[in-house]
């Protein structure tokens, strides 16, 4: 019985030593959303469709990003630019551009595959929802963060 009491005290001292050692360290918990989150330079967040310096969409509807995506979460429909209304600088543009974030693995292959740098990773990460259909981001939402001239 005396041996059991000694083992119990030794175990308590060992456990409390870990607690007391870490009590004086700086906490690693982020106070989000009260304090802004600091992102690493190469953070892969929610995608952003870019515009060029004239305010036209950079996406030319080439489908390379959709072909490179291992999760098959990118859906594109291309249309031809007309002479009176130009959407992008190329001959075609993406009339429909959807990303299904319930499937996206944020691998970055779509960004690497894009020849016009039309799609990039932003720093957005807030997409929690109870509606699965809200996880499909359409072209308009992906263009929101891109500056318009």
Roles of regions detected by a PLM:
Residues 1-103, 109-112, 116-149:
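Non-ligating segments of multi-cofactor redox enzymes
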């Amino acid at each position: 019985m005396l041996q059991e009491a000694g083992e119990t005290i030794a175990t308590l001292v060992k456990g409390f030593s870990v607690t007391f050692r870490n009590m004086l360290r700086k906490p690693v918990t982020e106070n989000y959303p009260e304090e802004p989150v600091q992102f690493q330079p190469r953070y892969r967040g929610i995608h952003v469709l870019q515009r060029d310096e004239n305010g036209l969409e950079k996406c030319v509807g080439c489908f390379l990003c959709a072909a490179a995506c291992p999760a098959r979460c990118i859906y594109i429909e291309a249309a031809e630019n007309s002479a009176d209304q130009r959407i992008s600088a190329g001959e075609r543009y993406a009339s429909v551009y959807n990303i299904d974030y319930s499937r996206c693995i944020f691998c970055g292959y779509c960004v690497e595959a894009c020849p016009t740098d039309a799609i990039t990773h932003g720093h957005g990460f807030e997409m929690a929802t109870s509606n699965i259909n809200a996880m499909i981001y359409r072209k308009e939402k992906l263009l929101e963060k891109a500056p318009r001239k």
